[in-house]
């Protein structure tokens, strides 16, 4: 799932969700329509089946993109910054939706995220990637990474909220 939802703007939400099924299955149009309704229902977007992406809020576009992402019942779902650009309440709802889909579909979820609250809520395990070193520099649960990892880059990332609240010089 892309940050923006990556929906085709000239297609309705329903058409966007149907597209992978039309391209990669031999399902009859009536079955595809039923599957589209099911997938949109799973993400709470059935009411928007005939709307265009431009008519949706950012959070709704992400949920519609998620419905399309699960249209073929994948074993693995990839999310790129799923809560980027969302307010905290919508972000928390999206986190819950991701967890519900993971549990309901039995899919493996891989998330790239800088949102600590989402990581602690969703992730069982984390791998910390360092762009400068172009390698994985730490691995463990979010709690372990926060409380036990001695790598200075990981420590700074996992404790940045404390740094942000105290100001750049720790003077509060």
Model regions: which residues?
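Short coil-to-helix segment of the ABC ATPase nucleotide-binding domain corresponding to the Q-loop/switch region
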Residues: 11-19
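Conserved ABC ATPase signature
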Residues: 52-56, 60
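A short, proline-enriched helix->beta-strand linker immediately N-terminal to the Walker B motif
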Residues: 71-75
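Catalytic Walker B motif of ABC-type/P-loop ATPase nucleotide-binding domains
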Residues: 77-80
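Helix N-cap at the start of a conserved alpha-helix in ABC-type nucleotide-binding domains
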Residues: 88-90
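Helical segment within the ABC ATPase nucleotide-binding domain
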Residues: 92-104
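Conserved beta-strand-loop-alpha-helix hinge in the C-terminal portion
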Residues: 132-157
């Amino acid at each position: 799932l892309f940050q923006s939802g990556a929906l085709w703007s000239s297609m309705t939400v329903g058409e966007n969700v149907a597209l992978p099924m039309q391209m990669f299955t031999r399902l009859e149009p009536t079955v595809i329509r039923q599957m589209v309704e099911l997938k949109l229902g799973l993400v709470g977007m059935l009411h928007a089946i005939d709307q265009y992406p431009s008519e949706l809020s950012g959070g709704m576009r992400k949920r519609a993109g998620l419905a399309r992402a699960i249209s073929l019942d994948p074993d693995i779902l990839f999310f790129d910054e799923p809560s980027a650009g969302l307010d905290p309440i919508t972000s928390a709802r999206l986190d819950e939706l991701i967890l519900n889909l993971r549990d309901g579909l039995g899919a493996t979820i891989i998330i790239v995220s800088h949102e600590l609250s989402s990581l602690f809520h969703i992730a069982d395990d984390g791998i910390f990637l360092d762009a400068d070193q172009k390698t994985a520099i730490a691995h463990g649960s979010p709690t372990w990474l926060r409380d036990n990892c001695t790598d200075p880059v990981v420590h700074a990332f996992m404790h940045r909220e404390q740094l942000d609240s105290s100001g750049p010089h720790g003077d509060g």
